[in-house]
C-alpha cells in the first residue's frame, strides 16, 4: 500500500484511483479529507449526480460504519462506485499503453455485454451483480466521460500539491527500500518471484530481463525516477507506471499473485474467479535449498542469515506458524490492520531482535477503550523465542559496529600517515 500512495503523490491516475477507492472501501475517506486536506467535493458532486438513482449496494464500506448517519453512508457508497469505475477505466488505458506489462487479461470492461448485464471470461458467461454503468460507452469502455475527466484532473492536482502528503512520501523515499539487509537479516515485503521449479523468474523491464536482487534494484530505481524525474517526462511517466506495476503485477516482488481480482470481488459471485493464485515462492519457502539460494543472492551467510517476510497474513487461528523453513524465514503478517484480524485471529506480530537473540511477539486484537474499561481486560501478548544465543551479541557484531570499526581503522591509517610524514601538516 505504501507504493500505491507514493505513486498517487506523484500524480499517477491509476494509483490515485486505487488510493481513494480503498479509503472508501474501508471507511477511511476522512484520512484524505481531514488528515491531508484533500478536497473530495468534486468527486462527491459527480457521484451524487451520476448515481442519484443507484443504491450502489455492492459498495458498502467495510469495518466500522456510523449507521446513525445514513446520508453520509449513502454518499460514501456512491463515491465508492464512481471512483471504482474510474479506476477500471484508467487501469485499462495503462494496460493498453504498456503491453510489456503483460496484463491484457485484466482488460475486463470490453468483455461486458452491457445490454444483458453479463461478462464473458475464458469463453464462459457470468451474470454481473450490478448492471448499472451510466458512464461507460460500450464502444469505448475505457474512455473517461467529460465529468470523470474533470474529477480525475482535480484529484491529480490536489494529490500532487498536498504539502503534508508530499512530506510523508519524501520520507518514505528517503528512508525506505524494496528490501533491506540488516544485521544478517534480509527484510522484504512480498516475495522473490520464482519459477515452478524454484529458480529465479526472469522479468522483462524495458527490453532487458531481470531476476532476484536485480529485479528489486531496477524496480526501486524506476519508482524513484517516477517521483523525482522533472525533465524527462517520458522517463517520469514510465516510472509512475512502474509504481502501479509494483502494486498489482504478478511479476512484482511486492505483490506476488497471479492477478488482483478487484473487479471480480465487486461484481461476480463465482468464488473461483475471486481467487488470487500465489507466486510459486509460497510453495518453495519451506525448502532450505531455495531459501539459501535467496540468502546468497542478497549476499548473506546461509548458515546464520534470516529472512523477514511480510505481506501474507498468517492464519494463527487455523494453526499456521509464522516460522518457516526451520527458523530461516519468518512471516510478519498485516494483523495490526483490523481488516485482516478475522483471517489471522490475532493483531499481528512484532519481531524483536536484540543482544539475546530473536523472538516473535503475537498480539491480541484491541477492540475498543470502552471494552477494556468495562471488562477490565488488558492487551495480552504471547512471546515465541526463536533462537537464544549463548554469548550476547555486542555492538561490534552489528552492521553499525562494523561501520564504526572501519572508521576507526581509517583514522588509525590517517594518524600513521601523519606520523610518517606522508601527509604534510598545514600551518
Model-assigned labels for residue ranges:
Residues 1-427:
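Feature recognizes metal-dependent phosphohydrolase scaffolds
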